[in-house]
């Protein structure tokens, strides 16, 4: 008699597990549908994030070399290049009238 009881329990186990999973799934769906505005807002924000990242990737593909070229100067000064020749000659309006001209060593 014990064998028939355990055999029936084993046969009923998959149906019980599937019934519990079905109840859990239906409860989850009810909660999901009840939070409709939150779900919609989440989907919109997720879509905005994905589209923004794709736009950045696409723009970098088109303009990446141009942007890199703006910040990279070939020369002896390293990654950003050397100092241009005319950069140390400031116009007189940028210096105070009584201030002496400073050199790089000061």
UniProtKB/Swiss-Prot annotation:
Cellular compartments annotated: Membrane
GO terms under cellular component: membrane
GO terms, biological process: osteoclast fusion
Membrane topology: Multi-pass membrane protein
Keyword annotations: Acetylation, Membrane, Transmembrane, Transmembrane helix
Spans through the membrane: 9-29, 44-64
N-acetylalanine carried by residues: 2
Cytoplasmic membrane side: 30-43
Biased composition (Polar residues): 81-90
Stretches the record annotates as Disordered: 74-106
Extracellular-side positions: 2-8, 65-106
Protein family membership: Belongs to the TCTA family.
Function description: May be required for cellular fusion during osteoclastogenesis.
Name of protein: T-cell leukemia translocation-altered gene protein homolog
Organism: Pongo abelii
Gene name of the encoded protein: TCTA
